[in-house]
């Protein structure tokens, strides 16, 4: 098995046909490993990712592992280091994983892990790893090495009340009536039917689905309602986070992978719910929502999810995926759990092997060195330049900056 590294979007685009073929063939493939999802993330963040490509002896494609790379200054070790995550995290994907042909999974997973051990990184965060027990053992086995430490991590929110390594989902029946009868309690079923009837006969309430003509407006509504709902929790970061959600959903709408519902009262939007559609795997994935909490006449969130479930069933979708988080409302709608994994693989030293950086991060490392120099963190800037030169000997920009920093230090030393 031969492993290649791809780190430009042009190269990634050339993989689409093979990627789609393997995606359709892999029973463990999930939407956040699809070419379309990753295309949005990778194109939006050039220079921050790499994709490992597995090819057989006959050069046919056997598997893909998309990764995000970050460059971090370690305060404790006083040097730059690299971290790896699943690349889907660039677009806040809830799941990560490995894509491979099932008949070659053992060779592919082993080859990816062995290749990763040769790269320069200190921490590999496999957050939201969605993978079978069999594949997990195959992938993790090579990291049982004295150079590495493997730690199981947790992921909770809401003061520990919500476990983000639990992923509730609903296996959908053939009809919405069957869903109401089989998946809901009698109390929830009666309440939902009552509110849906009210919605259907009302001239003041309406439910709309985003189309090309309303796309810009509807994404703005999402950002506004999400921000209003989360402002107390997110504080100064609210607008930045809302804008990124809008960017991700906008890309999905352009790619025709996003289904966006809005519930209105007259001309006022009450709530919005954005989901991604995986037609290949027959799955609708709830991604983000917003609502006006001041409106109390209807349970806006419940109605939006119920209408989303109905839309999924009417379009032949077999699974409604709530993604991460075991919030109680998901179970009131008939969800059952799937468990995700979150191992951290890190080097014993806590830094990159031999202090060298991943070659793909040189531009990022140079920017950090320049920033350190501007802020008079001279020693940090010197160390960063030295690491860059250890990785890429002869790099002219790093050498010039290092020479300038040394000259400044000598002048200060004589004063």
Regions found by a protein language model. Give the residues of each.
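Active-site/acyl-donor-binding loops of N-acyltransferases
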Residues: 140-177, 319-372, 403-410
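Acyl-donor binding region in acyl/amide transferases
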Residues: 49, 55, 72-160, 281-337, ...
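Short, charge-rich amphipathic alpha-helical segments embedded
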Residues: 387-411
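A conserved beta-strand-loop-helix scaffold within acyl/acetyltransferase catalytic domains
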Residues: 3-83, 128-145, 151-296, 403-408
């Amino acid at each position: 098995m031969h492993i290649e590294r791809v780190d430009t979007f042009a190269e990634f685009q050339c993989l689409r046909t093979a990627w789609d073929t393997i995606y359709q063939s892999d029973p463990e493939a999930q939407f956040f490993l699809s070419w379309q999802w990753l295309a949005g993330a990778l194109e939006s963040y050039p220079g921050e990712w790499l994709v490992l490509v597995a090819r057989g002896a006959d050069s046919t494609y056997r598997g893909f592992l998309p990764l995000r790379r970050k460059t971090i200054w370690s305060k404790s070790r006083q040097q730059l280091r690299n971290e790896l995550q699943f690349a889907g995290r660039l677009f806040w994907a809830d799941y990560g994983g490995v894509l491979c042909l099932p008949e070659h999974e053992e060779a592919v997973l082993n080859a990816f892990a062995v290749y990763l051990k040769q790269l320069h990184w200190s921490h590999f965060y496999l957050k939201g790893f969605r993978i079978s027990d069999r594949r997990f053992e195959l992938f993790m086995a090579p990291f049982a090495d004295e150079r590495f430490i493997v730690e199981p991590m947790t992921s909770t929110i809401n003061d520990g009340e919500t476990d983000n390594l639990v992923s509730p989902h609903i296996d959908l029946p053939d009809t919405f009536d069957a869903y109401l009868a089989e998946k809901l309690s009698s109390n929830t079923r009666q309440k939902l039917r009552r509110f849906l009837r009210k919605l259907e006969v009302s001239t003041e309430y309406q439910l709309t689905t985003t189309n090309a003509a309303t796309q810009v407006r509807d994404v703005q509504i999402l950002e506004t309602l999400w921000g209003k709902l989360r402002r107390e929790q997110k504080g100064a970061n609210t607008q930045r986070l809302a804008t990124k959600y809008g960017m991700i959903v906008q890309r999905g709408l352009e790619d025709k992978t996003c289904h966006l519902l809005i519930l209105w009262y007259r001309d006022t939007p009450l709530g919005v719910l954005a989901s991604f559609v995986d037609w290949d795997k027959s799955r609708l994935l709830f991604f983000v929502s917003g609502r006006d909490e001041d409106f109390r006449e209807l349970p806006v969130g419940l109605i939006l999810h119920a209408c989303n479930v109905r839309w999924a069933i009417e379009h032949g979708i077999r699974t409604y995926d709530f993604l991460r988080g075991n919030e109680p409302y998901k179970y009131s709608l008939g969800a059952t759990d799937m468990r995700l994994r979150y191992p951290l693989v890190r080097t014993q030293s806590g830094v990159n092997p031999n202090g060298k950086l991943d070659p793909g991060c040189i531009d990022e490392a140079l920017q950090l060195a320049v920033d350190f120099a501007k802020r008079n963190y001279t020693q940090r800037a010197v160390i960063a330049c030295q690491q860059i030169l250890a990785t890429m000997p002869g790099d002219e920009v790093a050498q010039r900056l290092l020479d300038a920093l040394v000259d400044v230090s000598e002048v200060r030393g004589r004063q």
